[in-house]
Amino acid sequence: LTCAQCHEVTSACQLWKSSAHSDVRCVDCHGTALSGGIKGLAEKTGMIYSHFTKKQTNEDVSLNEEQVLAVADRCAVCHQAEQAAWESGAHSTTYKDIFMDVEHNRMEKPYWDCFRCHGMHYDGTIHDLMSLEGKAEDWHLKNASQADRPAMTCLACHQVHAEQPQNKPYVAKNEKERAVSLTDTRSPATALYMRSEKLHLPSDKLYQTTMFDKDSVVKVSDDPNAWLCMQCHAPNNRREVGSEDDKTPTGLYEGMSCLDCHNPHSNQLKNNYRNVHLKK
């Protein structure tokens, strides 16, 4: 009996077969029933119970934060260059960096929507994560062991079982071929993890918003990868360029994609362009 023969995971297996990971075995990413110790064994036992009692469906199954971190560690085994780039950049920020930033906390108190971009897979509420009594300098993480956890893992922007047909396994591609696959706008390798739904939405299914500079419409890139970036690097509710966290390119750079200038994993510049973003 294999994973693919069990009807509960048929849809996931079909996606896997047509994905860039089709040459990777299920156990290489998910482990075995025993690899997660007692916790993993209890989970698999629960799945067997659900199978026979019909009390759980495919849609009810999702990864908790511990499992997401474990999968991200396994991503790094093959995606070593991407892991190194991520570790060197801002997207590897931790819970401590985000939620213990006193200066930022004085301007805006941490609340539930922070998890939309920072800590998407956190299992609890902001009050489970932090003690918010007193002044900003008194606020702290309730569990100190969570301080160095990454606030944005691989699965924040990537869907493992994403339908992205490949004519060559990713691990067999050279650096140039990998770069092409990462910036492919026809079948992007990115997806937005929606915390509220506990599901991924492929980047090419996201809405291409309209941005404004005063009364003028500013063209937004046609690259779905840029639409994903805009979910967190977002403008105010009037969609004004340079407002809030918006980084929409303007002027000579209008219509360019984030990936035209930035490494997708480190977020660092890969060219000499400057003054691309207008800041309000």
Question: Model-predicted segments: where are they?
Answer:
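Short sequence/structural segments immediately N-terminal
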Residues: 1-280
